[in-house]
Amino acid sequence: MRTGKTKTILDEFGELEAKGEIQHLLVVAPAGVYRTWKVDAEKHLSDELAKRVKLLLWDSKDGPAAREKLASIPQQGGPKILLMNIEALSTVEFAQALCARFIKAAPTMMVIDESTVIKSGKANRTKFCLAAAPHCKRRRILSGLPTPQSPLDIYTQFNFLDKRIFAEFKDLKAFQDRYAITRQIKTGNGRIIEIVSGFQRLDELQATIAKHSYRVLLKDCTDLPEKQYMVRHVELTPKQKQNYLEMKEYARTKLGNQEYVTSQNVLTHLLRLQQIVAGHTTSDGDVTVDIPENKTTEMLAILEQWVGKKAVIWATFDHDVKKIAAVLEKTYGPGCCARFWGGNRNTREADEARFKNDPKCRFMIATPASGGRGRTWDSADLVIYYTNSFNYEHRAQSEERAQAVGKKTSVLYYDLVCLDTVEEKVLGALRNKMSLSDAITGDDYKKWVV
């Protein structure tokens, strides 16, 4: 994470392409990650290669015509990069067929970013990647933490690289027998099952892995900037899409019928759209109803890579503070998070003290309106914006909570942004150091209600 993995791959692709050894680069990554490769490719590819390469981006929203057009491109000449989200390989036959065609058309380097996505050997996407691997001339896996939950997670990841690495083990069970300590327990219905209770011979396993990997630690990257920014793209669920479209049409109709539209009128409707994106709606009677969303899953995926470290999570809505806290407590156990928002005025100072002093209290969940000023939470090197406030001051001030005079570590800021929604506009305005109330004029509301 933040150590230059993407640039390393793009540089290697450029070198191998120049030698005539590789013509295609297939990058498979989680849905929230794979689109960032497009930005990085445009930034890091050499000018000469950038002029010749065709950059192909899988999009689950594409219709049949767009997909057929995409499918025809691998047969054309020249270097190409195909960016695919791993989730599509679980369920979409066309996505699998496209990757297979891409690999077959020319010598290919296949890369799996955040390679823990193939740690489960039973998953369809893992089976596809393992089947595709022998047909790729080069294979690479990238991960900030290849074993987030168990050393056993490494088995299928390295099998993708080369089955000869763990050739002595005929399957995962044999691998587990070598490196795991197991015991039998009796379940509530009387069944006897075997569970992993610990691990053994990890020095041996590490020595094997070291022969086939290159590791860079963040602390060794001495030239990192004080702040680094990344975006995780999140797709709306079907229910969110339906609600969002209905609310967008309602907003446009309502604003279109007004004789004079103010920025405040527009902001009111944008706030309702943002609530849907966050995963809930609020009726006129102030009753909040949850709707399925993918942001929480994406947040947990980021935190999974942040083992044992502290993080600050910003959420605009009080409802989301409660929801995030409940999810984290369920995932990491009671006492893992502190809160700082309008709903805990009497206890939030105590919560802050726990976050600062208790190693087990890893997460601070706060609203920018309550915790954005005057707080020092510099024990965190990760900041996640679950949602953004429309107020630039809220953003600027909240970013500084993880900073402190004399701090020697870089802070990573993640924005969870739902594609094709108001969130893209909001983040754009904040990066231009503008509050939405200043950026919006009444007569340009149509470009904001998107």
Model region roles, listed by residue range:
Residues 63-81, 87-106:
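Conserved helix/coil segment N-terminal to the catalytic DExD/H
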Residues 83-89, 97-104, 123-137, 141, ...:
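Inter-lobe coupling linker of SF2 helicases/translocases
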Residues 390-450:
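A conserved SF2-helicase RecA2
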Residues 1-4, 8-26, 98, 223-375, ...:
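Conserved Helicase C-terminal RecA-like lobe
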Residues 6-8, 21-43, 148-153, 316-318:
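Conserved Walker A/P-loop ATP-binding site and its immediately adjacent core
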Residues 33-61, 161-165, 331:
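Conserved helix-turn-beta segment of the N-terminal RecA-like "Helicase ATP-binding" lobe
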Residues 91-92, 149-151, 321-325, 349-352, ...:
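SF2 helicase motor core recognition
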